[in-house]
From Swiss-Prot:
Encoding gene per record: rplD
InterPro entries associated with the record: Ribosomal_uL4, Ribosomal_uL4-like, Ribosomal_uL4_dom_sf
NCBIfam families the record matches: rplD_bact
Keyword RNA-binding: yes
Domain of life: Bacteria
GO cellular component, one term: ribosome
PANTHER family, sorted: 50S RIBOSOMAL PROTEIN L4, LARGE RIBOSOMAL SUBUNIT PROTEIN UL4M
Name the record gives this protein: Large ribosomal subunit protein uL4
Keywords: Ribonucleoprotein, Ribosomal protein, RNA-binding, rRNA-binding
Amino acid sequence: MPKVALLNQTGSQVGEIELAEAIFGIEPNESVLYDAIVMQQASRRQGTHDTKGRSEVRGGGRKPWKQKGTGRARQGSIRSPQWVGGGTVFGPTPRSYSYKLPKKVRRLALLSALSSKVQNNEIIVLEGLAFDAPKTKDMAAVLNSLSVERKALVVTADYNETIALAARNIPGVTVIDAAGVNVLDLVANDKVIFTKDAVAKVEEVLA
């Protein structure tokens, strides 16, 4: 079983915690990780792009000149695609880019992301995390004591508004609860800070 140091809010070690081998100790599957990241990014696309076809462009209802006798090529509308200002042929239309990988694949990707973080010493486990009031300086002090200098993901057992408000003005810091742990957030952050209770909840959900 992988072991990591158990720290308090001041960054001092107060013990060790054993992580479940089946969740935090597997061999990461990079191919599945890639597929899961692409899936999440695709689902976040707005897909609101739109172009107008010849039937949607304003104007062009009248034939620009008679069919025969002018010496010019026949034309039916000034909004035909070959005209400047005409409609677009097969242009993009609004659509959803989201799709879902099989459940087993998504689970394997999440386990791979968690295990990769453990192997790279990018997981920090806190004995607890609590503030009397949602003050940014308190969260900044905790991150400073943990030597977190870049992007960090803070995972709590349940949604904690005080912690979320304390962290929202700190660039690069994201707070989620254990139920919201996902591959993209894990991979996108340099450090992942779990509370002890959050680890237990993640292990319970993924067991």
